[in-house]
Swiss-Prot record:
The keyword Ligase does not apply. This is N-lysine methyltransferase SMYD2-B. Protein-lysine N-methyltransferase that methylates both histones and non-histone proteins, including p53/TP53 and RB1. Specifically trimethylates histone H3 'Lys-4' (H3K4me3) in vivo. The activity requires interaction with HSP90alpha. Shows even higher methyltransferase activity on p53/TP53. Monomethylates 'Lys-370' of p53/TP53, leading to decreased DNA-binding activity and subsequent transcriptional regulation activity of p53/TP53. Monomethylates RB1 at 'Lys-860'. It catalyses: L-lysyl(4)-[histone H3] + 3 S-adenosyl-L-methionine = N(6),N(6),N(6)-trimethyl-L-lysyl(4)-[histone H3] + 3 S-adenosyl-L-homocysteine + 3 H(+); L-lysyl-[protein] + S-adenosyl-L-methionine = N(6)-methyl-L-lysyl-[protein] + S-adenosyl-L-homocysteine + H(+). It comes from Xenopus laevis.
Length: 430
């Protein structure tokens, strides 16, 4: 099992391990693909996607025993059985009380795979799961407590599979998963599941990435979003790049325990536009601006928590009130305004208020195109949502334009032969 051509693992100065190109890659070219080492479909997508291959289709067949896993056909059901059998009987016996988190489910599958798989897999051509960083020594008490809760859930729902694992090993594995796990998303960036892609995890982060990771079922694909020359390191982005430098680095330190020194973080050249203020005859004081940024960061976090327990109309009210308050100091293209508009759009989509969703989306798309890199999935998915909203409201001319804008980005990011591209082209023919 050879390594993909044109790439090699190396020691990246100041960053530890990394991946570099040994030949040049053109814009949109596939560098490599990586099948998932293990993966799990998210609970909310059960019945919409096959648990084994993640295909989205209607009329999937249920597992005869637990009635909670869904498959395209017998082949997919058989393919998934080594992993589904970890859960099937527990799902039956626990009923409504079966509630392990996605991280716990994924970790149980890693443990099961490690018991049966002794050779390196096709997902580990550059790096094995065992080599993952855990950053265990850097975890604060809150993060350690969350891991302890996950270990308890693992023992509760997967007792047969973890009876001979000691707590220290489980703590280490959960810390590895937290740093190296991936979320699989669809073309509109809706969450489909979680997975482990060891070779993809080898790539280091930059806020000016030269590759992008997309998914074809349960396979990750890595494509160039800039021209890459021989000898250059291959960088992906670990985080959402909308936010200003300080916020991005707070997120990187909290989740991955490092700060970024890429060109964007060194120059901060996009920050002034991302944090732009209203031109007022009586400009706000520096302290007022700082206070509003603090308020904005707090409301972002408050909303994230509120999603779990508030009603859609209450969530929309949080968005509207915060936009009203921030709008006294920030312009509409300020990233904190955009963040809350995006949340409001999501709530409108959930409530099937298509006109409301469109109102927010139309405000978001132009600044998104300015703040994000050229071939951004965030921009593509926004054009796609807008296009589908316009088409649904029979505004076909403007809908066609929006869908074509999404396609132009996706043909580079996903590759021209991706089934998402074929689906959108079908939508354009209607």
């Amino acid at each position: 099992m050879g390594q993909p051509e044109g790439l090699e693992r190396f020691d990246s100065p100041g960053k530890g391990r990394g991946l570099k190109a040994t030949r040049s890659f053109a814009l949109g070219e596939l560098l490599f693909s990586c099948p998932a080492y293990t993966y799990v479909l998210t609970d909310n997508e059960r019945g919409n996607h096959c648990d084994f291959c993640f295909t989205r289709k209607e009329g999937l067949s249920k597992c005869g025993k637990c009635k909670q896993a869904f498959y395209c056909n017998v082949d997919c059901q058989k393919g998934d059985w080594p992993m589904h059998k970890l859960e099937c009987s527990s799902m039956c016996s626990s009923g409504q009380n079966w509630c392990p988190s996605e991280t716990v489910r994924l970790t149980a599958r890693i443990l099961a795979k490690q018991k049966t798989q002794t050779e390196r897999t096709a997902s580990e051509r550059f790096m094995s799961v065992k080599e993952f960083e855990s950053h265990l020594s850097k975890l604060d008490n809150e993060k350690k407590e969350l891991i302890e809760n996950d270990i308890s859930a693992l023992h509760r729902f997967y007792s047969k599979n973890v009876h001979n694992c000691d707590n220290a090993a489980l703590e280490f594995l959960f810390a590895q998963v937290n740093c190296n796990g991936f979320t699989i998303e669809d073309e509109e960036l809706s969450h489909l599941g979680s997975a482990i892609f060891p070779d993809v995890a080898l790539m280091n982060h930059s806020c000016c990435p030269n590759v992008i990771v997309t998914y074809k079922g349960t396979v990750a694909e890595v494509r160039a979003v800039q021209e890459i020359h021989a000898g250059e390191e291959v960088f992906t982005s670990y985080i959402d790049l909308l936010y200003p430098t300080e916020d991005r680095n707070d997120r990187l330190k909290d989740s991955y325990f490092f700060s970024c020194d890429c060109r964007e973080c060194s120059t901060k050249q996009k920050d002034p536009a991302k944090l732009e203020l209203r031109k007022l005859s009586d400009p706000p004081s520096p302290q007022t601006v700082r206070d509003m940024i603090t308020y904005a960061r707090n409301v972002v976090e408050e909303f994230r928590r509120a999603k779990h327990y508030k009603t859609p109309s209450e969530l929309l009210e949080i968005c509207e009130l915060s936009l009203d308050k921030m709008g006294s100091v920030f312009v509409d293209s300020n990233v904190y305004m955009l963040h809350m508009m995006y949340q409001a759009m999501g709530v409108c989509l959930y409530m099937q208020d298509w006109e409301g969703a469109l109102k927010y989306g139309e405000k978001i798309i132009k600044p998104y195109s300015k703040h994000y890199p050229a071939y951004s999935l965030n921009v593509a998915s926004m054009w796609l949502k807008l296009g589908r909203l316009y088409m649904g409201l029979e505004k076909n001319t403007i809908g066609t334009k929006a869908l074509k804008k999404a396609l132009a980005i996706m043909e580079i990011a996903h590759g021209p032969d991706h089934y998402y591209i074929a689906e959108i082209k079908k939508e354009l023919e209607l």
